Regions:
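Active-site-proximal binding-pocket segments
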Residues: 339-347, 354-381, 386-403, 413
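C-terminal regulatory domains involved in ligand/effector binding and gene-expression control
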Residues: 75-283
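Short, mixed-charge aromatic SLiMs
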Residues: 44-57, 89-97, 349-361, 402-415, ...
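Conserved phosphate/anionic-ligand binding catalytic regions in large, soluble enzymes, centered on
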Residues: 8-26, 309-328, 371-379
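Non-transmembrane, aqueous-exposed alpha-helical and coiled segments at domain scale
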Residues: 2-12, 23-49, 60, 74, ...
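Accessory "access/gating" subregions that flank catalytic or transport cores
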Residues: 221-370, 478-486
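Alpha-helical support elements that line or immediately flank enzyme active sites
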Residues: 17-34, 326-338, 383-391
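Functionally critical mobile loop/hinge segments
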Residues: 49, 386-486
Length: 486
């Protein structure tokens, strides 16, 4: 059964599709070698990255993430320092610790291939893992796809390839396959839904809020204690990430652009007047009157800079957009009257339901639909969550979510230097405040709106399909080619 909490996974920066996903896929390959008793036969492993993974893989740490996964690491528990330096560590003796069980010869220049002019037809984020024995005979081969938000899907070694700028054949992409499927919730979910229209209708029919409906689905297959524990863990990491980002002693971000960390200086300046991070008192309900935009900017910058630095974060729903939902949730926590832990639960369940619709009916992958699928989806999710905790009806929640995505349609993914820094970090801050403004507009209305969220999601999907590949996480267009890397 699909859980909406899968939209929030604890992992590492800087990218969910280019760091988290490849690590998960590599770990799965290594685990299958272990399960099939093939580790002892394996003398060498080759990693081939295609399309967007190849074009921006160095900046996103895709190579390092895949190597860490082959060694048996997972994003939620990997030592971030070890992952950051794994290439240098392996180079010390030219070995890699396969599945944590056997040291095999590993020559980075030979065994990591960036295939920049080809991509898999099914998805631009394809990768191939090959294990060979001492005689160079193939032991095992797997193809995997990182489909956004840290989610992966297994392919087949014979999956077709196309040129990097070619349009995939009709029906070849995973987004098409997902759209045609029935439901991801399974028969045990009491309230399955595949569109926002269905979701709001179910809420109205059963007199439930979106969060209450989602809670019923989540607890149909596991205990409420387990669900609450997962939510608490997500919130705990989000809070720690904001705190770390605000107090970091590192002056610049890694990667070569020398982008300064601004959150610590901004925090000191704001805290000199009133340090909201170090107190529990709330101000009056500020949603309709004041956005406290500077603090929201700070929260988003803090998380985004932690992500860019390879720190521990929550994918929400992607790493490139990971600052938006924590920023808006911190806004609720610090600035809204009567904010409480149950409100955090309501916020995340509601936001997760909206994120599920984006993933199911379009894509949350920047390599597939551009940044509208990452920042746009997160803005919509954050708006929905905030609208829910300030008393919005399901119709007002949908309205806020629709406003959040409508004004991010067409947003390109053009990271300078292939790094999740420019324009990604500032873009998170802008979108966080946009989400709050979307809630303000929705709450001043009665929930009626002309454009539905389902229509906006479909529009995002179509826009992404029409978008040129150079604007979809390849660093071959936009700011990526107009800003000189110094």
């Amino acid at each position: 059964m699909f859980s909406v909490l899968d939209m929030f996974t604890i992992g590492v920066g800087p990218s969910s599709s280019h760091t988290v996903g490849p690590m998960v896929a590599a770990h799965a390959f290594a685990s299958s070698l272990q399960a099939d008793h093939l580790v002892d036969r394996t003398a060498r492993v080759k990693i081939t990255l295609y399309g967007s993974l190849a074009l921006t893989g160095l900046g996103h740490g895709t190579d390092r993430a895949a190597m860490a996964g082959l060694e048996g690491n997972l994003p939620a528990t990997v030592d971030t320092d070890h992952m950051m330096h794994i290439r240098e560590i392996c180079a010390l003796d030219d070995t890699l610790n396969l599945a944590g069980l056997k040291r095999i010869h590993f020559d980075y220049d030979r065994d990591v291939v960036f295939e920049q002019w080809k991509r898999m037809a099914a998805h631009p984020n394809g990768m191939r893992f090959q294990a060979v024995d001492a005689a160079a005979s193939l032991v095992d081969e797997q193809v995997w796809y990182s489909i956004g938000g840290g989610f992966v899907r297994k392919g087949a070694p014979e999956d077709p390839m196309i040129g990097i700028h070619e349009r995939p054949p009709e029906g070849a992409s995973f987004a098409d396959a997902d759209k045609s499927s029935s439901t991801d919730f399974g028969v045990e979910a009491p309230y399955p839904f595949s569109s926002c229209t269905e979701l709001v209708s179910l809420c109205r029919e059963h007199h439930l809020s979106i969060a209450e409906l989602v809670w019923a689905n989540e607890t149909a297959s596991r205990s409420g204690i387990q669900v609450r524990s997962d939510i608490d863990a997500i919130w705990r990491v989000m809070r720690a990430c904001v705190d770390h980002g605000c107090t970091s002693a590192e002056p610049t971000l890694p990667g070569g652009l020398d982008v300064p960390r601004r959150a610590p200086k901004m925090y000191r300046r704001l805290a000199s007047n009133s340090d909201v991070l170090r107190r529990d008192s709330r101000r009056k309900d500020a949603v309709l009157e004041s956005s406290d935009a500077a603090w929201v900017d700070l929260f988003a910058l803090a998380v985004s800079e932690e992500n860019a630095g390879g720190g521990r974060i929550v994918t929400a729903p992607t790493n490139g957009s990971a600052g938006i939902i924590p920023a808006v949730l911190h806004y609720y926590w610090h600035f809204v009257d009567n904010a409480n832990e149950q409100g955090v639960v309501t916020f995340l369940l509601t936001a997760g339901a909206i994120g599920y619709l984006f993933k199911r009916n379009a894509s949350i992958s920047g390599a597939e639909v551009g940044c509208q699928g990452e920042v746009g989806s997160a803005c919509s999710m954050a708006a929905a969550g905030l609208a829910a905790v300030v008393g919005g009806t399901p119709e007002q929640v949908e309205n806020a979510a629709e406003i959040g995505i409508e004004h991010n349609l067409g947003l390109t993914c053009d990271p300078v230097g292939g790094l999740v820094q420019i324009p990604c970090i500032e873009r998170n801050a802008m979108a966080a405040n946009t989400a709050i403004n979307a809630v303000r507009m929705a709450m001043l209305g009665d929930g009626s709106h002309i454009v539905t969220l389902d229509q906006a999601i479909e529009t995002m999907k179509q826009t992404g399909e029409d978008m040129m590949a150079k604007y979809k996480e390849t660093s071959k267009g936009g700011l990526a080619v107009n800003v000189v890397e110094c």
